[in-house]
Amino acid sequence: MSQPDKVLILDFGSQYTQLIARRVREAGVYSEIHPCTVTAKEVAAMAPKAVILSGGPSSVADADAPPFDPAVFDLGLPMLCICYGMQLLAHHLPGGQVAASTDREYGRADLQLLADTPLFAGLPQKDGHIVWMSHGDKVMAAPDGFVVAARTKNVDIAALANASRRIYALQFHPEVAHTEDGERILHNFLFEIAGLTSGWTMSSFLETELASLKEKVGDDEVVCALSGGVDSTVVAVMLHKAIGKKLHCIFVDNGLLRMGEGEEVAAYLREHFDLNLHYVDAAKLFLDKLAGVTDPEEKRKIIGKTFIEVFEVEAAKLPKVKYLAQGTLYPDVIESVSFKGPSAVIKSHHNVGGLPEVMKLALIEPLRELFKDEVRKVAVELGMPDFIIWRHPFPGPGLAIRIIGEVTEERLEILRRTDKIVQSELVASGWYRKVWQGFAVLLPLKTVGVMGDGRTYENVAAIRVVDSLDAMTADWSRLPSEILAVMSNRIINEVKGVNRVVFDVSSKPPATIEWE
């Protein structure tokens, strides 16, 4: 099968870079993000049909501005330069000029179209278009051969066009939802200017990937760590379709799962696929190692280390295994190559990252090109049930990081019952599919309450529900107060050990989605 047309996005550290990639893919065109440090020769070798330069927080005049090879402009490829990318264009090409702006623009701005350009074809004929700005510097003079295509109140040059070279630039962000007609502008660039074909679908991805997996594995065998989440389950089903009984799945029940979670996924896989499924009950081992531990980082490290130890023992029983399959997604890959470099570690990530080296296994990552929403589309293509496809993300350390303080069997049981009510009410009210994630947290404090004629002194539970696209940023969900009232009433009446419920109204940033 032929490879789909590819758009290369060069990342200069913008918070919106992944959003650009998502918007391009939503239009049916495959996109890849690469650091801005790639050379023109490397770009050409990747054979993209078009290039997009992202925005970024730097100034082109800074001594430590992101490195960039201006020869990229001479490759003859259609290019769209966004925000910092536009300033870069004016900085490097003859005739262009960039200066620091005294009037910084952040947020909504009114765009006036000045030139008839294919980039703005089909936009409504009106005086102003709302666009989203986020910049300090601005272009003072257009490079030779470029026409000024738009302006705003504070910026005389808000868009540039060179039709013969098929290079266009925007000072605003067409990828964000706040920009009116941003989708149309990107569509014009991809299909009218670059002439790309809309061939990136999850069915085409699946067809190509299954053939690739079959060829790569050959007669060898693969071990896959199942977590119960959608990513690892999709990986398992894909591999089973590609290599059948040469796949071995290991499900380690660490005792930190949601109510019925392990049994539910294991039952589905056993019922619908003739899988080699090894179910390991290691709950007591994990709880023993977590006894007395209250520090969240320590909890994560203990759980990660113990998982590797248990997985190693089980995988050693499978001597023919040569590959380890993981549910790595594209945002994980991007983070490792981003121009921003190693970010400050906010929390250690629990995954099986240490296993390939420890066990000397080659790695298979069938989903490493996909975003989370695309993984769900693959799951639909595979005919998987809704309860797996739409399951909310769940952290590797499980309920251990939703119990603030020490993890005990008693506290786990309280949290499981509380969380089950939150989940069931989200489903019953029709909100489960509307939000990114919803769950309960058990706090390390008790408060006084009254039940019947008696005084109580019980635990406090928090409800956390957020909206997000990719978990990189999130806002708290505006659940109707009626739903919160039902949740709270049920929790206090049905869960022994909780007498107070609070609702978390923090966004990410500054808070994180999980409490630990």
Curated annotation (Swiss-Prot):
Residue sites binding ATP per the record: S227, G228, G229, V230, D231, S232, T233
Stretches assigned to the Glutamine amidotransferase type-1 domain: 6-199
Domain called GMPS ATP-PPase: residue spans: 200-391
Signal peptide segment: none
Active site (UniProt): C83 (nucleophile), H173, E175
InterPro entries from the UniProt entry: Class_I_gatase-like, GATASE, GMP_synth_C, GMP_synth_GATase, GMP_synthase, GMPS_ATP_PPase_dom, NAD/GMP_synthase, Rossmann-like_a/b/a_fold
GO cellular component: cytosol
Pathways per UniProt: Purine metabolism; GMP biosynthesis; GMP from XMP (L-Gln route): step 1/1
Record key words, sorted: ATP-binding, Glutamine amidotransferase, GMP biosynthesis, Ligase, Nucleotide-binding, Purine biosynthesis
MF terms in GO: ATP binding; GMP synthase activity
Enzyme Commission code: 6.3.5.2
Catalytic activity: XMP + L-glutamine + ATP + H2O = GMP + L-glutamate + AMP + diphosphate + 2 H(+)
Entry keyword annotation includes Ligase: yes
NCBIfam families with a match to the protein in the record: guaA_Cterm, guaA_Nterm, PRK00074.1
Function field: Catalyzes the synthesis of GMP from XMP.
Assembly behavior: Homodimer.
Name of this chain's protein: GMP synthase [glutamine-hydrolyzing]
Organism listed in the record: Solidesulfovibrio magneticus (strain ATCC 700980 / DSM 13731 / RS-1)
Lineage: Bacteria, Pseudomonadati, Thermodesulfobacteriota, Desulfovibrionia, Desulfovibrionales
Gene name of this polypeptide: guaA
